[in-house]
C-alpha cells in the first residue's frame, strides 16, 4: 500500500491548478451547491431548457472522490486491465457488444487486417486490453458476420447506444488507462444513462439531447477531458492531432453548437409561452401545425439506406446547394462544400486506399503509389481522417447554426416552416451519408467511432432546429393573417 | 504544446455594421486581410493563443458578432459570457462613432451581473485622408467610459496585435488581482492546464516499479 502513497502525490498536483483557482473565488458555496444538485439532476428526465450547469466541478468532484483508488489505477495499463473488471467490466461488456457488432462489418471487409483494426481501434478508443477485445471481436465477428454482410455500413448502425457511449469512451479512453477510475466512472455514468433509457436498439439519436446536459456541454466535458489528458501526456504531442473532440473544437464546432443551442432554447421558451397564452380552437390549430413540423423532423431516415457509390464532388455540392436553396436563407454552404472536397481530393491524391487489399477493383492502385504510401504515413492518414471528420462535422454544425440565425432573423421569405423542415431533414440525411462515405474511404485505418459521432452530432444539431422552426411558423402566422 | 494555456478569455467584438470587425479578427487570427467578406450572420468564432509573458499563454476565444440590426437580439445574448470586448467604430464613418454610446448602453443592460473590460477601437486608420473622427475626440470618449483607445488597420496590419494583447494583459491583471474570478456558469474566464506540475502516467508507472524493487 505504500506504493499508492507515493503515486498519489503527482495525481493530486495534477488537479491542483484548477482547485487552486476555485478556492480563490469568494462565492465558493454556490459551487458546492451545484455539486450536490448535480447527481440528482442526472436522473431527472428531459429538462432541455434548464440552465446549463458548469461541468468543471463535476469532473473535479469525480477526481477528488476517487482519488485514493485512482492512484492505484493510474499506476499503469497492467493495473487497469486487471482492476477494471471488478469495478466496471459490466459497462465495458455491454458497450463492447454493440461496438463489436458494428465493428464487425469493418472486420469482415478488412479480413486479414483484423489485428490492425483492433490495434487501431484500441488506440483510438482506449480499450484496455487488446487481447481480451480481440477474442471478443472474433466471437462477435463470427456471430454477426452472417447477418451483417459487407454492404452494411460500419457507421450506419451504431447511432444509438454505441455512439453515445463511444463519445465518452473515445475521448476518455486514454484517461481510463492513465487517469483511472474517474474516467471509468464518467463512462459508467454515460453508459448507465443510456442503458436506463432501456432502448439499445433505437436508431435515432435522442440519446445525447434528451438528458439533462446539453449536447455541447457533453462535448465540452469530453473535450476538457481530452485536453487534460493531452496536457498530461506532454511527451506524446502528436496524438493531439488525432483527438476528435479537440479538433472539433478547433474548427469551432463546439462554439457553433453552443450558439445553436442558445437559439434553440430561446425559441423553445417562446413557443411554450405562446402555447400557454392560447386557448380553444386557436390552440388546437396551432398544435396541429406544430405536430406536422415535428413529423418533418422525424422523417429523416438516417440509416439503413441502400449503399450508394461515392458521389463526385459536383454531385455533393450540387445536392447540398439545391437543398440549401430550398431553405430560402441568404447564405451558401460554400465552406462545407470546400471542406468536403478538400477531404476527397486528399484521399484521391495521397491515399487511394493503400492498405486495403480488397477484391473489389474500385479505385485500382498504382504499384508505385502503393510504395509511396509506406507504413510511416499510416499515422498521417489516421490523423487526416479524424481531422477531416471533425472539420466536416464542425462545418455542418456551423451551417445549422447559421440557418437557425437566418430563419429567426433573416428577411421574410416565401417559404413555410414545413418546407424548410423537410429540406433540413433531407440535408441531415445527406450530411450523415457524406460523413459515412468519407469515413469509409478511411476505413482501413479508422475505427468507426469518428463517423458515428459525427453523424449523431449532426442529427442532434438538426433536432435543435425544431423549436427554431416552430417559432418561425408561429411568427409567420401572426405576420401574415390574410395569407 | 499549443494546447497548454493558463486561462481562456472569451472576448466579444461589437460595433456597427461594416466597421470591419470580421476583418480585424481575421487579421489577428489568420494573419491575412480579406478584402471582400459577406456580412456576418449572427455570430462567428475564432480563437488564438497569446503569450502575455514568457511561457504564459492565454487562449482567446473571440466572438465575432453581426453588426446588422436584425441580429441584435442574438448578439445581445452573448455579452453575458464575455470577459472582454473590442468596441469598434470606423474612423471614416462618423455615424459609427456616434453609435458607440448606444453600444455601451446596450452592453451595460445585458451583461449583468458581470462586466466586460472594453477597449475602444478606431478602425480603418489607414484611410486617414477620409477621417471623420479625430483621435482627440475618440480618446475623450474612451476616457469618459474608462476605456483605452487604440487605432487600428486590418489592411495595413497596424496595431491589430496590440489591440488584442493589451486588452488580454489588462484582463489578466484583473484576474491575477482577483477583481475578476472564475465563476460557475460563466464562460468569460476559464482556467487552463499548467504543464509543469503535471506528471505523465509513464513517470507514475516508473516510480511504482522502483518501489516494487
Swiss-Prot record, chain B:
Residues 35-43 are annotated as: Switch-I. Its EC number is 3.6.5.2. CDD domains: Rab39 (cd04111). GO terms for cellular component: cytoplasmic vesicle membrane; Golgi apparatus; neuron projection; plasma membrane. Keywords: Autophagy, Cell membrane, Cytoplasmic vesicle, Golgi apparatus, GTP-binding, Hydrolase, Lipoprotein, Lysosome, Magnesium, Membrane, Metal-binding, Methylation, Nucleotide-binding, Phosphoprotein, Prenylation, Protein transport, Transport. Regulated by guanine nucleotide exchange factors (GEFs) including C9orf72-SMCR8 complex, which promote the exchange of bound GDP for free GTP. Regulated by GTPase activating proteins (GAPs) which increase the GTP hydrolysis activity. Inhibited by GDP dissociation inhibitors (GDIs). GO terms for biological process: autophagy; protein transport; Rab protein signal transduction; regulation of autophagy; synapse organization; vesicle-mediated transport. Mg(2+) binds at residues 22, 40, 64. It catalyses: GTP + H2O = GDP + phosphate + H(+). GO terms for molecular function: G protein activity; GTP binding; GTPase activity; myosin V binding. The keyword GTP-binding applies. It is found in: Cell membrane; Cytoplasmic vesicle membrane; Golgi apparatus; Cytoplasmic vesicle, Autophagosome membrane. A lipid is attached at residues 211, 213 (S-geranylgeranyl cysteine). Coiled coil: none annotated. It comes from the Eukaryota. It is a lipid-anchor. Transmembrane segments: none annotated. The modification Cysteine methyl ester is found at residue 213. Interacts (GDP-bound) with C9orf72; C9orf72 in complex with SMCR8 acts as a GEF for RAB39B. Interacts (in GTP-bound form) with PICK1 (via PDZ domain); a PICK1 homodimer may allow simultaneous association of RAB39B and GRIA2 to PICK1 which is involved in GRIA2 trafficking. Interacts with isoform c of RASSF1; the interaction is strong. Interacts with isoform a of RASSF1; the interaction is weak. Interacts with the DLG4/PSD-95. Interacts (GTP-bound) with HOPS complex components VPS39 and VPS41. Switch I, switch II and the interswitch regions are characteristic of Rab GTPases and mediate the interactions with Rab downstream effectors. The switch regions undergo conformational changes upon nucleotide binding which drive interaction with specific sets of effector proteins, with most effectors only binding to GTP-bound Rab. Belongs to the small GTPase superfamily. Rab family. The small GTPases Rab are key regulators of intracellular membrane trafficking, from the formation of transport vesicles to their fusion with membranes. Rabs cycle between an inactive GDP-bound form and an active GTP-bound form that is able to recruit to membranes different sets of downstream effectors directly responsible for vesicle formation, movement, tethering and fusion. RAB39B is involved in autophagy and may function in autophagosome formation. This is Ras-related protein Rab-39B.
Amino acid at each position: 500500500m505504500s506504493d499508492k502513497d507515493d503515486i498519489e502525490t503527482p495525481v493530486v498536483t495534477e488537479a491542483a491548478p484548477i482547485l487552486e483557482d476555485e478556492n480563490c473565488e469568494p462565492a465558493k458555496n454556490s459551487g458546492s451547491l451545484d455539486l450536490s444538485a448535480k447527481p440528482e439532476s442526472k436522473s431527472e428526465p428531459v429538462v432541455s431548457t434548464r440552465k446549463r450547469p458548469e461541468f468543471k466541478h463535476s469532473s473535479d468532484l469525480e477526481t477528488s472522490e476517487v482519488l485514493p483508488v485512482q492512484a492505484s489505477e493510474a499506476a499503469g495499463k497492467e493495473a487497469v486491465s486487471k482492476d477494471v473488471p471488478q469495478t466496471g467490466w459490466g459497462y465495458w461488456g455491454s458497450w463492447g457488444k454493440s461496438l463489436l457488432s458494428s465493428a464487425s462489418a469493418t472486420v469482415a471487409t478488412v479480413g486479414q487486417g483484423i489485428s490492425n483494426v483492433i490495434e487501431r481501434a484500441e488506440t483510438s478508443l482506449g480499450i484496455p486490453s487488446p487481447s481480451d477485445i480481440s477474442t471478443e471481436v472474433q466471437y462477435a465477428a463470427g456471430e454477426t458476420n452472417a447477418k451483417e454482410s459487407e454492404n452494411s455500413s460500419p457507421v450506419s448502425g451504431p447511432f444509438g447506444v454505441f455512439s453515445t457511449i463511444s463519445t465518452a469512451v473515445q475521448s476518455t479512453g486514454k484517461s481510463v488507462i492513465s487517469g483511472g477510475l474517474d474516467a471509468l466512472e464518467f463512462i459508467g455514468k454515460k453508459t448507465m444513462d443510456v442503458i436506463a433509457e432501456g432502448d439499445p436498439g433505437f436508431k435515432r439519436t435522442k440519446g445525447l439531447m434528451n438528458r439533462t446536459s446539453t449536447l455541447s456541454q457533453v462535448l465540452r466535458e469530453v473535450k476538457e477531458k481530452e485536453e487534460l489528458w493531452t496536457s498530461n501526456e506532454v511527451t506524446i504531442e502528436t496524438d493531439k492531432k488525432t483527438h476528435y473532440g479537440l479538433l472539433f473544437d478547433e474548427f469551432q464546432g463546439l462554439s457553433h453548437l453552443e450558439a445553436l443551442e442558445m437559439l434553440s432554447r430561446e425559441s423553445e421558451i417562446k413557443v411554450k409561452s405562446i402555447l400557454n397564452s392560447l386557448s380553444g380552437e386557436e390552440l388546437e390549430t396551432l398544435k396541429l401545425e406544430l405536430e406536422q413540423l415535428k413529423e418533418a423532423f422525424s422523417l429523416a431516415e438516417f440509416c439503413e439506406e441502400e449503399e450508394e457509390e461515392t458521389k463526385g464532388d459536383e454531385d455533393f455540392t450540387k445536392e447540398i446547394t439545391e437543398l440549401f436553396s430550398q431553405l430560402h436563407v441568404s447564405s451558401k454552404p460554400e465552406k462545407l462544400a470546400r471542406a468536403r472536397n478538400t477531404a476527397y481530393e486528399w484521399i484521391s491524391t495521397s491515399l487511394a486506399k493503400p492498405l486495403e487489399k480488397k477484391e473489389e477493383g474500385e479505385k485500382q492502385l498504382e504499384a508505385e503509389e502503393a510504395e509511396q504510401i509506406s507504413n510511416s504515413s499510416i499515422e498521417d492518414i489516421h490523423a487526416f481522417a479524424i481531422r477531416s471528420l471533425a472539420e466536416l462535422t464542425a462545418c455542418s454544425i456551423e451551417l445549422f447554426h447559421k440557418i437557425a440565425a437566418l430563419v429567426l432573423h433573416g428577411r421574410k421569405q416565401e417559404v413555410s416552416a414545413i418546407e424548410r423542415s423537410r429540406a433540413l431533414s433531407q440535408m441531415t440525411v445527406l450530411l450523415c451519408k457524406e460523413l459515412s462515405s468519407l469515413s469509409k474511404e478511411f476505413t482501413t485505418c479508422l475505427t468507426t467511432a469518428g463517423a458515428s459521432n459525427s453523424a449523431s452530432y449532426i442529427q442532434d444539431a438538426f433536432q435543435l432546429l425544431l423549436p427554431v422552426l416552430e417559432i418561425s411558423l408561429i411568427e409567420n402566422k401572426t405576420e401574415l393573417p390574410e395569407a | 504544446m499549443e494546447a497548454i494555456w493558463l486561462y481562456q478569455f472569451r472576448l466579444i467584438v461589437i460595433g456597427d455594421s461594416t466597421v470591419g470587425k470580421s476583418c480585424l479578427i481575421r487579421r489577428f487570427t489568420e494573419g491575412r486581410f480579406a478584402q471582400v467578406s459577406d456580412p456576418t450572420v449572427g455570430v462567428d468564432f475564432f480563437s488564438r493563443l497569446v503569450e502575455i509573458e514568457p511561457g504564459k499563454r492565454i487562449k482567446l476565444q473571440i466572438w465575432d458578432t453581426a453588426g446588422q440590426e436584425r441580429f441584435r437580439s442574438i448578439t445581445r445574448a452573448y455579452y453575458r459570457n464575455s470577459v472582454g470586448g473590442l468596441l469598434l467604430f470606423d474612423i471614416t464613418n462618423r455615424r459609427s462613432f456616434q453609435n458607440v454610446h448606444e453600444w455601451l448602453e446596450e452592453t451595460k443592460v445585458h451583461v449583468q451581473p458581470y462586466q466586460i473590460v472594453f477597449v475602444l477601437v478606431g478602425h480603418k486608420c489607414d484611410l486617414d485622408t477620409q477621417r471623420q473622427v479625430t483621435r482627440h475626440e475618440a480618446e475623450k470618449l474612451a476616457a469618459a467610459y474608462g476605456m483605452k483607445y487604440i487605432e487600428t488597420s486590418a489592411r495595413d496590419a497596424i496595431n491589430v496585435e496590440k489591440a488584442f494583447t493589451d486588452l488580454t494583459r489588462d484582463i489578466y491583471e484583473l484576474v491575477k488581482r482577483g477583481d475578476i474570478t472564475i465563476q460557475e456558469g460563466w464562460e468569460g474566464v476559464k482556467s487552463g492546464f499548467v504543464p509543469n506540475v503535471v506528471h505523465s502516467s509513464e513517470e507514475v508507472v516508473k516510480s511504482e516499479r522502483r518501489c516494487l524493487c
